[in-house]
Amino acid sequence: MRLLIIFILMLSNSFASEVTDIKNLVINKELKSYSDITFLDIQNKELNLNDYKGNLVILNFWATWCAPCKDEMPSLDLLGENPNLDNLKIFPINIGKDTNQKSLTFFKDLEIKNLEIYFDSPNTLAKKFKLRGLPTTIFFNKDGLEFARIIGSIDFADEKF
């Protein structure tokens, strides 16, 4: 996991648009800036990505009906328990039309302990980021700029990282 974060940090300083050896990872040629990136927590409180500048941010888009999302979520959860990653903020954002209870059950069934549930309502981020499938994970540098994304599932605990 530590190698994953080091790799991602190195990528945040890279401007080469390419798919690397890591399955489904696309590195942006140029950093992408977005305005008004907001999402909701489980209490329907609005959060803004700008409030997390100074941190490396991961937005992971998922849904309860998505089998690859179910496979990926436990390894994403492991990133949240690493004490060496203080400046990493992970926001798993449900883009399905699921109820809070269904999302909580999904996390409980997978024994997710280090992540909280967030929602994209009403799917504005899915459109803004032009998501092509689930799961999709988008990486933002400390300036709040997108530098890479993973389209599809990945094992965040894989030794490649």
Language-model features: locations:
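Structural microenvironment flanking redox-active thiols in thiol-disulfide oxidoreductases
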Residues: 70-110, 121-127
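Active-site acidic short loop of glycosyltransferases
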Residues: 52-55, 85, 112-114, 131
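N-terminal "domain-start" segment that seeds a small globular fold
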Residues: 17-49
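Hydrophobic beta-strand anchors of alpha/beta hydrolase catalytic cores
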Residues: 58-59, 90, 137
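Thiol/disulfide oxidoreductase modules built on the thioredoxin-like
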Residues: 109-113, 120-161
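Sec-dependent N-terminal signal peptides
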Residues: 3-12
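Short active-site neighborhood of thiol/selenol oxidoreductases, capturing the structured segment around
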Residues: 48-70
